[in-house]
């Protein structure tokens, strides 16, 4: 329906519609190539209900991986850091380091930590990158299961603690 005419379109047979109806809550599809735009997207479908609570239908919108990448680029802590979004299957769907559409197995740090991140849902851990200690903080988005993480240099993450230590040491 790339001409804008959707009169012949029946969404009830589409997977996103069926999944939103079955889940009775917002659902996120896996990443796929949109037939019209040819861009990589994730669809978000949300059921809606009649006043009596019975299912009335579902609406769907696509999020391009480009848009998600722009949002990840804004994940910063005091202006520093790199962001990433990983889906529950281990597919990196957005990254400030150009890793979108790669699997966590291709990144040694993520490969070693991913199952723990899935299980714990949120937390942080330390790693070294390019000779600098980094803190990786992450949290799972409940509605999608996506893990959103940001890596920040340790010197930035703990700067206030370091200055507090100097203050107390000087007493």
Indicate where each model-derived feature is located.
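Short N-terminal helix-loop-first-beta-strand/juxtamembrane motif that initiates sensory/input modules
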Residues: 22-28, 73-93, 118-126
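Tryptophan-centric aromatic hotspots in well-structured domains and transmembrane helices
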Residues: 16-19, 28, 82, 144, ...
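Extracellular/periplasmic ligand-sensing ectodomains of membrane signal-transduction proteins
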Residues: 1-41, 91-109
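Stable alpha-helical elements in mature extracytoplasmic
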Residues: 16, 68-71, 113
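Extracellular/periplasmic juxtamembrane segments that couple receptor/chemosensory ectodomains to their
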Residues: 50-51, 88-89, 99-100, 104-167
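Selective recognition of signaling/oligomerization transmembrane alpha-helices
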Residues: 169-171
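Conserved beta-strands of PAS-like sensory domains
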Residues: 11, 32, 37-76, 93-97, ...
């Amino acid at each position: 329906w790339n001409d804008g005419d959707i009169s012949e379109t029946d969404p009830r047979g589409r997977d996103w519609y069926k999944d939103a109806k079955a889940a009775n809550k917002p659902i996120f599809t896996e990443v796929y190539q949109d037939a019209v735009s040819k861009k990589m997207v994730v669809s978000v479908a949300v059921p809606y209900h009649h006043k009596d609570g019975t299912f009335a239908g579902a609406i769907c919108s696509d999020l391009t991986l480009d848009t998600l990448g722009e949002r990840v680029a804004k994940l910063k802590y005091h202006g520093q850091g790199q962001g990433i979004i990983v889906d529950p299957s281990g597919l990196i769907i957005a990254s400030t380091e150009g890793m979108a559409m790669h699997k966590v197995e291709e990144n040694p740090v993520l490969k070693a930590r991913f199952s723990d991140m899935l299980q714990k849902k949120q937390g942080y851990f330390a790693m070294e990158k390019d000779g600098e200690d980094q803190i990786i903080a992450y949290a799972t988005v409940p509605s999608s299961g996506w893990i959103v993480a940001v890596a920040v240099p340790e010197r930035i993450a703990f700067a206030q603690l370091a200055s507090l230590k100097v203050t107390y040491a000087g007493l």
